[in-house]
Swiss-Prot record:
Part of the 30S ribosomal subunit. Contacts protein S5. The interaction surface between S4 and S5 is involved in control of translational fidelity. This is Small ribosomal subunit protein uS4. One of the primary rRNA binding proteins, it binds directly to 16S rRNA where it nucleates assembly of the body of the 30S subunit. With S5 and S12 plays an important role in translational accuracy. Keywords: Ribonucleoprotein, Ribosomal protein, RNA-binding, rRNA-binding. One of its GO terms (biological process) is translation. HAMAP family: Ribosomal_uS4_B (MF_01306_B). Residues 96-156 form the S4 RNA-binding domain.
Amino acid sequence: MARYLGPKLKLSRREGTDLFLKSGVRAIESKCKIDNAPGQHGARRGRLSDYGVQLREKQKVRRMYGVLEKQFRNYYKEAARLKGNTGENLLQLLEQRLDNVVYRIGFASTRSEARQLVSHKAILVNGQVVNVPSFNVSADDVVSVREKAKKQARIVSALELAEQREKPTWIEVDSKKMEGTFKRVPERTDLSAEINEQLIVELYSK
């Protein structure tokens, strides 16, 4: 499946919630009609079946983290193999992606932008260049901006925006050094309450 390259706000409108695909700290309600789905008949949101609700939740989370369908299914399979709650395991695996950690630290204003920084070799993990967005970040790994990329306007701007966002408690950020230490894997209570991961588990369990 190809990566979606169309208008980002359209995806948020389709899911009826902010997927944080656009930069900035303004509420998404000020940018678009979030309660209406895109298209001519967007104002009419039909009642979904149980399967439809589960599918929408999966699509919402997949798009939020910018993961393709096959990748997402593989993450679910890995989450199911791990001990503990499958849904929580899934979210933790997604949170450990390097592109997501770069976004959480504040080097990028969106996960899509973070993915570009990683792919363009602007990011170091423990002092080594890593250009794989799906790279799994472990506890105590230090993620930083490569020296020659530190003056990039988009990174400087993203760090300024990040100061206005709630900082993740599981990452220690040093904005001056442009580095962040992934202290621990986030717990479920650290993450968005708007995600119902159990619906995804129910979908894939069929």
